[in-house]
């Protein structure tokens, strides 16, 4: 077999891992972000905190990126232990911050909590959604290269037909994250004529057309390894995003934004019925002739074309979630209620997923069926609830230490029900000492360019080295240098105030 055939075989016929393990893996970076924020607050209070760009970059890289690289490789069998370790570290940091608090130092704990619940948080910015999208981008960047090395567990790779691999969540999670901040959600309504709105939607996808066609031409011209049952012969994820964007733009013109969940449920139920009671599933799996033909555009790209219905469902669910999470809330107590609600809905979706897998069909990314949509939405909501909780805890820590502020977190703003002098000090000193260097902010600013850069460097590494026969130590070195280089480029762009856009 040629090197290309060996690499293609290396990522085929895989069945994934458990839903629980993927969920644990998703929660881990949320806890890392929490500990990173608590450590910043603790360091600012206990010792002089270095605010140079190099120090901040190295800290973010070590606390946010390196743990993910290790989790997806050498410590993949100890995800639960990693979570417990980070939680214990975070609890210790919070304990130290509380006992060193500069505000309400002699006030009973009940009174401290009561005053904190009355504090207001900045409503125009939600760090949980930013962190969600960055986590998905970083995970994807690591996985697309790591999957070609033996050190990367095969159970985390994309599944062939049924199953829940960690990389299976990546594609659905990207759609969900993009939907939460789509123009419709940020604007809350379609304020212009339908024709102009559709025209702008069509114009907004042309960079994706360029990227999708460019990827297709490059892959075919250099003979790069492909997994044809993933999207088809010519299709790729850029084309899926294009179709989803256009279809959902049309749906959001026809249906009210706050009814997006009804549209999502309707589409996925009808799609699952079509898979079960029409020849649609047979066509998707075996082609129109039933023998796996790839003749004709539909047969050649049947997986990518048909599965877009599932991704449309996920997008509409993301729109509904974005409307709820980005809704302005007056006080911390309101955000606690919202976090509990998101967590409760996530649990409800996991229960529904179990019922569907037992009685209807297992999760299939290849088909993007009902179970897949439920799994992606449930996992996304669970991650989002962890990030919301982390944001609230960080806000509490900032509330305790006067003048502290964590980049990419909520700002505490004055509340009329809180002690006036303390509220003012929270605002003035925090703004005066506000750190401006943050890897999360940098990655969020240039997410598309980071994804493209990761794809290009992944291709270059695969073309220049034999990844299939690389040892564990060298794999970690390559992955670390790869992520360090990509993150550093994005970080420097952010320092210079540059956003790379192609439109």
Swiss-Prot record:
<feature type="topological domain" description="Cytoplasmic">
    <location>
        <begin position="402"/>
        <end position="447"/>
    </location>
</feature>
<feature type="topological domain" description="Lumenal">
    <location>
        <begin position="72"/>
        <end position="74"/>
    </location>
</feature>
<feature type="topological domain" description="Cytoplasmic">
    <location>
        <begin position="43"/>
        <end position="48"/>
    </location>
</feature>
<feature type="transmembrane region" description="Helical">
    <location>
        <begin position="340"/>
        <end position="360"/>
    </location>
</feature>
<comment type="pathway">
    <text>Glycolipid biosynthesis; glycosylphosphatidylinositol-anchor biosynthesis.</text>
</comment>
<keyword id="KW-0012">Acyltransferase</keyword>
<keyword id="KW-0256">Endoplasmic reticulum</keyword>
<feature type="topological domain" description="Lumenal">
    <location>
        <begin position="361"/>
        <end position="380"/>
    </location>
</feature>
<feature type="transmembrane region" description="Helical">
    <location>
        <begin position="22"/>
        <end position="42"/>
    </location>
</feature>
<feature type="topological domain" description="Lumenal">
    <location>
        <begin position="281"/>
        <end position="304"/>
    </location>
</feature>
<dbReference type="GO" id="GO:0006506">
    <property type="term" value="P:GPI anchor biosynthetic process"/>
</dbReference>
<protein>
    <recommendedName>
        <fullName>Glucosaminyl-phosphatidylinositol-acyltransferase PIGW</fullName>
        <ecNumber>2.3.-.-</ecNumber>
    </recommendedName>
</protein>
<dbReference type="GO" id="GO:0005789">
    <property type="term" value="C:endoplasmic reticulum membrane"/>
</dbReference>
<feature type="transmembrane region" description="Helical">
    <location>
        <begin position="448"/>
        <end position="468"/>
    </location>
</feature>
<feature type="transmembrane region" description="Helical">
    <location>
        <begin position="75"/>
        <end position="97"/>
    </location>
</feature>
<feature type="topological domain" description="Lumenal">
    <location>
        <begin position="469"/>
        <end position="472"/>
    </location>
</feature>
<keyword id="KW-0325">Glycoprotein</keyword>
<feature type="transmembrane region" description="Helical">
    <location>
        <begin position="237"/>
        <end position="257"/>
    </location>
</feature>
<keyword id="KW-1133">Transmembrane helix</keyword>
<dbReference type="GO" id="GO:0032216">
    <property type="term" value="F:glucosaminyl-phosphatidylinositol O-acyltransferase activity"/>
</dbReference>
<feature type="topological domain" description="Cytoplasmic">
    <location>
        <begin position="98"/>
        <end position="131"/>
    </location>
</feature>
<feature type="modified residue" description="Phosphoserine">
    <location>
        <position position="415"/>
    </location>
</feature>
<feature type="transmembrane region" description="Helical">
    <location>
        <begin position="473"/>
        <end position="493"/>
    </location>
</feature>
<comment type="similarity">
    <text>Belongs to the PIGW family.</text>
</comment>
<feature type="transmembrane region" description="Helical">
    <location>
        <begin position="49"/>
        <end position="71"/>
    </location>
</feature>
<dbReference type="Pfam" id="PF06423">
    <property type="entry name" value="GWT1"/>
</dbReference>
<keyword id="KW-0812">Transmembrane</keyword>
<feature type="topological domain" description="Lumenal">
    <location>
        <begin position="1"/>
        <end position="21"/>
    </location>
</feature>
<comment type="function">
    <text>Acyltransferase that catalyzes the acyl transfer from an acyl-CoA at the 2-OH position of the inositol ring of glucosaminyl phosphatidylinositol (GlcN-PI) to generate GlcN-(acyl)PI and participates in the fourth step of GPI-anchor biosynthesi. Required for the transport of GPI-anchored proteins to the plasma membrane. Acetylation during GPI-anchor biosynthesis is not essential for the subsequent mannosylation and is usually removed soon after the attachment of GPIs to proteins.</text>
</comment>
<keyword id="KW-0597">Phosphoprotein</keyword>
<feature type="transmembrane region" description="Helical">
    <location>
        <begin position="260"/>
        <end position="280"/>
    </location>
</feature>
<feature type="topological domain" description="Cytoplasmic">
    <location>
        <begin position="182"/>
        <end position="201"/>
    </location>
</feature>
<feature type="topological domain" description="Lumenal">
    <location>
        <begin position="223"/>
        <end position="236"/>
    </location>
</feature>
<keyword id="KW-0337">GPI-anchor biosynthesis</keyword>
<feature type="glycosylation site" description="N-linked (GlcNAc...) asparagine">
    <location>
        <position position="13"/>
    </location>
</feature>
<feature type="transmembrane region" description="Helical">
    <location>
        <begin position="132"/>
        <end position="152"/>
    </location>
</feature>
<feature type="topological domain" description="Cytoplasmic">
    <location>
        <begin position="326"/>
        <end position="339"/>
    </location>
</feature>
<feature type="topological domain" description="Cytoplasmic">
    <location>
        <begin position="258"/>
        <end position="259"/>
    </location>
</feature>
<keyword id="KW-0472">Membrane</keyword>
<feature type="transmembrane region" description="Helical">
    <location>
        <begin position="305"/>
        <end position="325"/>
    </location>
</feature>
<feature type="transmembrane region" description="Helical">
    <location>
        <begin position="381"/>
        <end position="401"/>
    </location>
</feature>
<dbReference type="InterPro" id="IPR009447">
    <property type="entry name" value="PIGW/GWT1"/>
</dbReference>
């Amino acid at each position: 077999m040629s090197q290309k055939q060996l690499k293609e075989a290396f990522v085929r016929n895989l069945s994934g891992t458990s839903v629980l393990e993927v969920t644990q893996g998703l929660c881990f970076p949320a806890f890392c972000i929490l500990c990173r924020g608590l450590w910043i607050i603790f360091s600012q209070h206990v010792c002089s905190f270095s605010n140079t760009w190099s120090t901040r970059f190295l800290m973010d890289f070590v606390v946010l990126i390196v743990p993910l690289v290790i989790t997806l490789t050498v410590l993949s069998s100890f995800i639960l232990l990693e979570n417990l370790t980070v939680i214990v570290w975070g609890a210790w940091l919070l304990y130290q911050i509380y006992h060193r608090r500069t505000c309400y130092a002699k006030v009973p704990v009940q009174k401290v909590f009561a005053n904190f619940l009355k504090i207001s948080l900045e409503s125009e910015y939600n760090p949980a959604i930013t962190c969600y999208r960055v986590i998905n981008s970083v995970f994807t960047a690591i996985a697309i290269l790591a999957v070609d090395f033996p050190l990367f567990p095969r159970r985390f790779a994309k599944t062939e037909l049924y199953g829940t691999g960690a990389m299976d969540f990546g594609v659905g999670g990207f759609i969900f994250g993009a939907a939460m901040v789509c123009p419709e959600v940020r604007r809350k309504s379609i304020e212009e004529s339908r024709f102009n709105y559709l025209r702008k939607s069509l114009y907004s996808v042309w960079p994706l057309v360029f990227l999708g066609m460019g990827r297709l031409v490059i892959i075919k011209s250099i003979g790069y390894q492909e997994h044809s049952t993933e999207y088809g012969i010519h299709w790729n994820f850029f084309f899926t995003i294009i179709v989803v964007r256009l279809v959902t733009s049309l749906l959001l013109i026809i249906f009210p934004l706050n009814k997006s969940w009804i549209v999502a449920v309707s589409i996925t139920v009808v799609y699952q019925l079509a898979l079960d009671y029409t020849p649609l599933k047979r066509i998707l799996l075996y082609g129109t002739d039933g023998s796996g033909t790839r003749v004709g555009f539909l047969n050649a790209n049947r997986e990518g074309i048909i599965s877009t219905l599932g991704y449309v469902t996920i997008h509409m669910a993301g729109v509904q979630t974005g409307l709820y999470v980005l809704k302005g809330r007056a006080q911390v107590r309101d955000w606690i209620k919202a976090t509990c609600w998101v967590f409760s809905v996530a649990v409800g979706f996991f229960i529904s997923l179990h019922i569907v897998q037992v009685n209807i069909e297992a999760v299939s990314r290849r088909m993007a069926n009902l179970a897949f949509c439920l799994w992606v939405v449930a996992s996304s909501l669970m991650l989002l609830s962890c990030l919301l909780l982390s944001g609230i805890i960080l806000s509490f820590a900032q509330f305790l230490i006067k003048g502290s502020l964590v980049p990419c977190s909520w700002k505490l703003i004055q509340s009329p029900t809180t002690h006036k002098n303390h509220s003012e000090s929270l605002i003035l000193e925090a703004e005066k000492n506000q750190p401006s260097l943050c890897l999360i902010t940098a990655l969020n600013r240039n997410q598309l360019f980071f994804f493209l850069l990761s794809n290009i460097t992944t291709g270059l590494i695969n073309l220049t080295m034999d990844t299939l026969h690389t040892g564990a130590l060298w794999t970690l070195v390559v992955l670390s240098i790869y992520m360090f280089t990509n993150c550093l480029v994005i970080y420097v762009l952010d320092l210079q105030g540059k956003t790379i856009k192609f439109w």
